Amino acid sequence: MSLNGRVLFITGGSRGIGLEIGKRAAKDGAKVVLAAKTAEPHPKLPGTIYTAADEIEAAGGEALPIILDVRDEVNVRDAVEETISHFGGIDICVNNASAISLTSTPDTDMKRYDLMHQINGRGTYLVSKYCIPHLKQSNNAHILNLAPPLDMKPKWFGPHLAYTMAKFTMSMCVLGMAEELKSNSIAVNGLWPRTAIATAACLLYTSPSPRDGLLSRMPSSA
């Protein structure tokens, strides 16, 4: 599949995996929407939607930075409409935005619990919902969720139940929408790269050895 001229709508695209997906697509001449909350520099995490847009264009693509909170339905609707107005369509929806807290049940603050479910599950569902009518107009449409394989082994739930529950809602969106949308020729897939453990957001919530800790606690795609 050639990405030249294709429009990617990427949530959480200001840094990390989302930005890397955008940059790789840009090398093939894609048009990349960077839809994320970070418009101003974060004290601990590098990158904004505007610096990300510069990187996309440097890689050879076209960029459209949009401030987006995936929890806000009006914001999501308007972001999709802005994309259509600017680029004329959407070919690929990448649900990358996610919240993480690798904490036990007693140590999980309910505000953090709610945030993870609002962003991971509801946000993925909401963004997909508004992209689908436009994906139906594409001749090679895809939805890609940054989500793990559904593995019901207790070991994936025990250490950080709230996060696993929230993240698996994204995985269930893959299974459900793949079945729902197959008659519309919209492919729906999940991507769970091992490199996800090296993103700055993950490093904020793990110590003293974030890479090793997450590698031992995340389900693999094998």
Where are the language model's segments positioned?
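Short-chain dehydrogenase/reductase
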Residues: 2-87, 100-101
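Active-site loop of short-chain dehydrogenase/reductase
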Residues: 6, 61-62, 89-90, 135-149, ...
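Conserved small/polar residues in nucleotide/adenosyl-binding loops
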Residues: 205-210
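Substrate-binding pocket helix/loop in short-chain dehydrogenase/reductase
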Residues: 104-105, 109-114
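A short helix-coil junction within the Rossmann-fold of NAD(P)-dependent oxidoreductases
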Residues: 28, 86-87, 103-104, 130-139, ...
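A short, exposed helix-loop element centered on a Lys and neighboring polar residues
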Residues: 128-129, 175
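Catalytic loop of short-chain dehydrogenase/reductase
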Residues: 136, 142-182, 192-197
